[in-house]
A protein has these predicted regions:
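Active-site and adjacent substrate-binding regions of carbohydrate-active enzymes
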Residues: 1-492, 498, 502-585
Length: 585
């Protein structure tokens, strides 16, 4: 039965997102570059997989020196991807399958080829002279860190035409816009509307923390930036209800939650600090990195949601970890210098876990059950590999592998014409790893992901429930309870942070805040116990579930009844990297 769009304006709280690099997804016209029509051709696949919302990487006209994050014209679709009509068709076709679409929006900077910058650099007194940030010397805002430390030496770059320095937080070919100029603010708001009018369901807001600069600050998370986001949100709420803003703010949890405002800024934020800690936890075979960061994560304001992810189109960023943990991550996951990019590791999920299926399943099971909406990266559902010999972050942006045919079924162009070579190595190459083969094989990772998503879809507790970390005697075992009370929109109870009443550096107590309302709908499960073995070896665990005495425990994937909870400890054995999702009824 075809799915239809839910009318719930808070759809994003229970959605599964899928990140698409249009350039690498499917080439419909044989020019070697993926395009919007190609993506339309593959919507049936995405519907089958069970995702609810696509996140499109920037599709705007661009010189493509930073994967399209260097926008040359905000008002046009890049000719290689198609035209505005193709985007409208894509949105309509996706909606007809119950899938929403959000687009990346790069507000912080443009390409130096953008006509605004060309005009701005032409003199000190043209109408766009102050649309960017110009100075006579490069000494301003020394407290602002350099983000691409491996390629840029300064946040200032000299422009020989204007004979001045301009400010940039990323590549020097990406000058920052000047948001202190009200004309820039208005121009950006009209671009937002221009694209929302195509029917898009919202935006992933690229690099939002850096919109403003102020003397004596790091130029991140400034009050002016939050004021701008409130303005943006109010304009969207007024004219485009049900659309979502998802912030890319690579920040510590306490700064991150500010991007939700009082439910009046972004609806969602990526949980950047959690991501590397999931990789750390499985390599250390200890739950501590995860429980520690959950304990530091403040409660979500009403109507908000985390975006959770394992991998994306960028490097596995290590900005939000200590120096010691960064060294550990480089040693464990990025030993070859070619794998290091910017402040992180440019590798895909499967090679990171050495192609271990149980480990890939474990990480995804955590991704699908921790509080937030999971965001998958194209190809990871196949356990696609990477190519560390490619420059910048292209290692993880190779063509999607559809079939074992020429070019992996991605394009009919000559191999030499492809935007990047598809993987052809014996382990991850398209002849071994592709959609066609995995679709036929019921035991494939692709089918496993599809089944997990269909189970997740049946239990809104994963999107809407509160979390409490349970005390477990075995440090290699992570266990938590997600619970949801259907009559209240978000069942976060009595707890200051979303890890319930965690204390110190680990889970030590079980909250007594869980109870069941008598008026909850009959038969609807409200409580899911999730247990994960982070170790390579089988592990026993003993959980204190006394307050659930006499309740029934049912394994969710197979609906298999497990022993009821008796007095005191509930004992479980988990296989290597094993996990369980249990409903407690
Ligand atoms: C995007 C990157 C991009 C950068 C500059 C980011 O945060 O995810 O891919 O290079 O912004 O636009």
């Amino acid at each position: 039965m075809p799915r239809s769009l839910t009318e719930n304006p808070r759809w994003y709280q229970t959605a599964v997102f899928y990140e698409v690099f249009i350039r690498g997804f499917f080439d419909s016209n044989g020019d070697g570059i993926g395009d919007l029509r190609g993506l339309i051709d593959k919507l049936d696949y995405l519907e089958w997989l069970g995702v609810d919302c696509l996140w499109l990487l920037p599709f705007y006209s661009s010189p493509m020196r930073d994967g399209g994050y260097d926008i040359g014209n905000y008002e046009e679709v890049d000719a290689a991807y198609g035209a505005r009509e193709d985007l409208i068709k894509l949105v309509d076709e996706a909606h007809a399958r119950g899938i929403r679409i959000i687009a990346d929006l790069v507000m912080n900077h443009t390409s130096d080829q953008h006509i605004w910058f060309q005009e701005s650099r032409s003199s000190g007194d043209n109408p766009k002279a102050d649309w960017y940030i110009w100075r006579d010397d490069d000494s301003g805002w020394p407290e602002a860190r350099i983000i691409f430390t491996d390629v840029e030496q300064s946040n200032w770059a000299w422009d020989s035409e204007r004979q001045q320095y301009y400010w940039h937080r990323f590549y020097s070919h990406q000058p920052d816009l000047n948001y202190d100029n009200p004309e820039v603010v208005e121009a950006m708001l009209s671009i937002v509307k221009l694209w929302l009018d195509t029917g898009l369901d919202g935006f992933r807001l690229d690099a939002v923390p850096y919109l403003y600069q102020r003397d004596g600050t790091s130029g991140e998370n400034l009050p002016e930036t939050h004021a701008f986001l409130r303005r943006l949100r109010s304009e969207i709420d007024a004219r485009y209800p049900g659309r979502v803003l998802l912030a890319e703010a690579n920040q510590w949890p306490t700064d991150l939650v500010d991007y939700f405002g009082s439910s009046d800024e972004c609806h969602m934020c990526f949980h950047f600090p959690l991501m590397p800690r999931m990789f750390m936890a499985v390599r250390r075979e200890q739950r501590l990195p995860i429980t520690e960061i959950l304990a530091q994560t403040p409660e979500l304001p009403d109507g908000c949601q985390w975006g959770l992810f394992l991998r994306n189109h960028d490097e596995l960023t290590l900005e939000m970890v200590s120096d010691e943990d960064r060294d550990f991550m480089y040693a464990e996951y990025g030993a070859d210098p070619r794998m290091k990019r910017h402040l992180g590791i440019s590798r895909r999920l499967a090679p990171l876990v050495e192609n271990s299926r149980p480990l890939a399943e474990l990480l995804h099971a955590m991704l699908f059950s921790l509080p937030g909406s999971p965001v998958l990266y194209y190809g990871d559902e196949l356990m696609m590999g990477d190519n560390v010999y490619l420059g910048d972050r292209d290692a993880v942006r190779t063509p999607m592998q559809w079939t074992p045919d020429r070019n992996g079924g991605f394009s009919r162009a000559d191999f030499a014409q492809l935007y990047l070579p598809p993987l052809m190595d014996p382990v991850y190459g398209y002849q071994a790893v592709n959609v066609e083969a995995e679709y036929r094989d019921q035991g494939s990772f692709l089918h496993w992901v599809q089944k997990m998503l269909s189970v997740r879809r049946r239990h809104e507790v994963f999107g809407l429930g509160s979390i409490e970390i349970l005390a477990v005697d075995n440090p290699s075992v992570l266990a938590f309870i997600r619970s949801y009370y259907p009559e209240s929109s978000l069942a976060v109870k009595d707890s200051e942070n979303f890890a319930g009443n965690l204390e110190g550096d680990d889970a030590s107590q079980i909250s007594t805040s869980l109870d069941f309302r008598e008026d909850s709908k009959e038969g609807e499960e409200r409580c899911v116990l999730c247990i994960f073995n982070l170790s390579r070896f089988a592990q026993p665990a003993s959980l204190d579930l006394a307050r659930f005495k006499e309740r029934q425990v049912t394994e969710l994937l197979g609906r298999v009844p497990f022993p009821d909870i008796q007095e005191g400890d509930y004992r479980i054995t988990l296989g290597p990297h094993g996990f369980y999702w249990f409903s407690i009824t």
